[in-house]
Amino acid sequence: KAADEASSFKQECAELKSKTEKLVGLLRQAARASSDLYERPTCRIIDDTEQVLDKALSLVLKCRANGLMKRVFTIIPAAAFRKMSSQLENSIGDVSWLLRVSASGDDRDDEYLGLPPIAANEPILCLIWEQIAILYTGSLENRSDAAASLVSLARDNDRYGKLIIEEGGVGPLLKLLKEGKMEGQENAAKAIGLLGRDPESVEHMIHAGVCTVFAKILKEGPMKVQAVTAWAVSELAANYPKCQDLFAQHNIIRLLVSHLAFETIQEHSKYAIASHKATSIHAVVMASSNNSTVKVAVDEDHQSQISHPMGNQTPNQMHNVVTSTMAMNGGVKLPQKLGNNHVRSNSQGNVKQFHHIYYQPQQNGSMSGVNMKGRELEDPATKAYMKAMAARALWHLAKGNSSICRSITESRALLCFAVLLEKGSDDVQFNSAMALMEITAVAERDTDLRRSAFKPNSHACKLVVDQLLKIIEKADSELLIPCIKAIGNLARTFRATETRMIAPLVKLLDEREAEVSKEAAIALTKFACTDNYLHLDHSKAIITAGGAKHLIQLVYFGEQIVQLRALVLLCYIALHVPDSEELAQAEVLTVLEWASKQSYMTQDETIDTLLQEAKSRLELYQSRGSRGFH
């Protein structure tokens, strides 16, 4: 109407009117489809369009000025109409794109939607909007592809991940994870794991209901999706430790332990061991062991006294008994190859198969609420990946959290970790070692947890320690450092007579890698420090194993990160066993006197105090000894 009443620039006003009518027609379409429009770009586009229409109206109203004086004082540059025409064109393009991108899967064309003018300065934003819109309205196949695109974007750049969250991508990703086909679910789980890179992002996902969806998938989803979901749990827990308890409240700890236990250890009946198979295995085991008793743990998940399913059989004996019996009964085929690390050949070409307790699930059984249907038919690589990701998730959930560590240790997880440390694939072994390292670190600080979970007479604890020591004795694995730390964390749980872990740790003091020597020194310090009730016994064991000479070498010639750790350990040994003949012969007092003159070694007040005490004790006892000898 204002354009029709214009008294100047009539042609330009008519052009603006034509474009405005076209824009209004598009806005009416948008209003009719408002419930289907993707909210984030809709808000921005409608706000911009409203401003453009206000400016267009203001410009046209100026052209209605009547009278010479009004026209003189109302100066309208010709460029203003060109600029306004361009802005209206942009708004038409934006609203047209919004209608296309918000169309349902059936109405959407497969052709490229183009770049809306509003996103010209930030084209990646347009791509994110487009993919999220597909997640809202596309077919399941298109939604899967859109999730894969978001995975690629989130992996490439942290800022893109932030944009995906800000533009409302979490909700439709969770919906796809819950309702999509397997490939779409995998892509959605990957995207969620990649998006949870900082506390704010994870908190946003928690509010969006990620815990509930993850619990549902870990209970009922396909194993491949469950494995990626377990990985996503580990990512979220690693980047926002405050979400650990929320995951625990949704039963995720128990579900992860169930995945870890599947085909790993013989379980209570709730873990679905077929009774007729168990009976036949039991009979053969009893005959094989010359009528000795094989005690199988049947505790509930929340009891801590656990007996190993192998009883008093060696692992290889148990493996032979179980696999041969099940092969005879037609329960399962003997495994040929389970991933890269399940079958290894030695130089003579003989094949050593890692023992693995297989069993036939009951038809209607369920494993702690996990859907068992078809799980035994999954390929070995998927099963191994599932275990690796379950262990990884438990590792990050356990870190620094006493209540979760208690839940884990009261379940079958310790037995699982012990078995998987020996025979799992590389990833499974590493994640199991890291989980044990974190659980033992919490137990070191939490007396109640340490006493309940790592009692000296606990069969599960013994098995864990055995496996940790095997890895430490081999000393050629990436598992070495987490295993050293785990043994050090358990230093207060060992009896005075149990010194078998000292010698392997002392041997590592002579390791070429500084990091290994440092961790070995830290672990031994936990045995020899005053806080350890058995510090005297452990200090003597370190001396007997030849620790003094290695420590002297490290204090004199080690890298700086090792020197201080070695000095602290040497001080504790000198403090507790000052009358040792070995220390006197090794001239430890001379070493301590030299160290006390090195400024960088005495900067720490605690170390300086310990050093002076150790020197005083050695001087006192060794001066007495010298008088006795002469």
Residue positions per predicted region:
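Alpha-helical solenoid repeats of the armadillo/HEAT superfamily
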Residues: K1, K10-K22, I45-K55, K62-A65, ...
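Short, charged/polar, low-complexity loop and linker segments
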Residues: K1-S7, V24-P41, L61, A65-F73, ...
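N-terminal "cap/leader" segments of large eukaryotic alpha-helical scaffolds
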Residues: K1-S8, P77-R155, G339-L377, K615-H630
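Short, surface-exposed loop/turn segments at secondary-structure junctions
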Residues: A6-C13, A33-R44, A65-I75, L163, ...
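Eukaryotic intrinsically disordered, low-complexity regions
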Residues: P117-G196, E203, H207, A215, ...
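Intrinsically disordered, low-complexity acidic Ser/Thr-rich regulatory segments
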Residues: Q303, M310-A393
